[in-house]
Every structure is written in structure tokens, then in C-alpha cells.
């Protein structure tokens, strides 16, 4: 009887230790799992567009991280704090000004365009609360997210 309890306890410890690594969600090696998704922090800074392309190449369905709850945000911030000291991490939110549906105040359609190349993308901080925007061309670390 004592052996069964010991073995059961051992299996429970192994299961609990693997549940936070992504192993329970079939995440690739080096990726961490949370709520049916896999996450990985990358420490080589890239522009927003290059980071998004990179995430798409890493795994099927991969993108820059998106947040859908405060619990998910807390999970990713904790994951980042174990890997980086960076305060600027790209996330998959952007506003590309020259792709919006614009119109003139007099009702005329916008036909002539002279947009500057600057677009703004959103980053989050591993040490400060809230999201901020900055030029997409600037470099930042990033977190990729994919379905488990």
C-alpha cells in the first residue's frame, strides 16, 4: 500500500512539474504552454514586421503574442522576466495608418495619397503596466504565440 501511494505521489509531482512547461499542451521544445497556446520569448531584437514574419515561420499558426485576459498577460510577463530584462516587447497589435479607410471632411473620397512611411505598433513592458505604441520600424524583443 505504501508503494502505491509513493508511486502515485511521484507521478503527481512529475505531472505538475510538466504542466507549466508546455509539455501537457504538446508545445515544441523551448516553448511554454498556457490555456491551449504555446509561447516563446525571443531575445534578438527585430522590427515589428520582421518579428511577425519570424513568428509565422516558427510554427503553424504562429504570430506575435496577443492578449485576451489579465491572467494571460501575467503568464507572459512572468515568462519574459525569466528570460529577458527588456522593457520593450512587441505584441501583435498595430495600426497601419495608410491602410485605414480615410475620407475628406467634405465627403470626397481619398484618391491622392502622400502618407509618410511611419506606422505605429504596440509593445508591452515586462516591468510597467499598460500598452504603449512606437514606430514599427524600431527594434524590440518579442514573444511568439501559437495554438497548442
Swiss-Prot record:
Keywords attached to this entry: Disulfide bond, Hemostasis impairing toxin, Secreted, Signal, Toxin
Q: Which Pfam families match?
A: Lectin_C
Record's subcellular location: Secreted
Specify whether Ribosomal protein is a keyword of the entry. Answer: no
Q: Name one GO molecular function term.
A: toxin activity
Task: Kindly list the cysteine pairs connected by disulfide bridges.
Answer: 27-38, 55-144, 121-136
What GO cellular component term, any one, is given?
extracellular region
| Record's function text | Interferes with one step of hemostasis (modulation of platelet aggregation, or coagulation cascade, for example).
Extra information:
Shows greater sequence similarity to the beta than alpha subunits compared to other heterodimer snaclecs.
The entry describes its oligomerization and partners as: Heterodimer; disulfide-linked.
The protein here is known as Snaclec B1
* Gene source species: Macrovipera lebetinus
Amino acid at each position: 500500500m505504501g508503494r502505491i501511494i509513493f508511486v502515485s505521489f511521484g507521478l503527481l509531482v512529475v505531472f505538475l512539474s510538466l504542466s507549466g512547461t508546455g509539455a501537457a499542451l504538446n508545445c515544441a521544445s523551448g516553448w511554454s504552454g498556457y490555456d491551449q497556446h504555446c509561447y516563446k520569448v525571443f531575445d534578438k531584437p527585430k522590427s515589428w514586421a520582421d518579428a511577425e514574419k519570424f513568428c509565422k515561420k516558427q510554427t503553424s499558426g504562429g504570430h506575435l503574442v496577443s492578449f485576451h485576459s489579465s491572467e494571460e498577460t501575467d503568464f507572459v510577463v512572468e515568462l519574459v522576466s525569466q528570460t529577458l530584462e527588456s522593457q520593450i516587447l512587441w505584441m501583435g497589435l498595430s495600426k497601419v495608418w495608410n491602410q485605414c479607410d480615410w475620407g475628406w471632411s467634405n465627403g470626397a473620397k481619398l484618391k491622392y495619397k502622400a502618407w509618410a512611411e511611419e506606422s505605429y505598433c504596440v509593445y508591452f513592458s515586462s516591468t510597467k503596466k499598460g500598452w504603449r505604441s512606437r514606430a514599427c520600424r524600431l527594434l524590440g524583443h518579442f514573444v511568439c504565440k501559437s495554438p497548442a
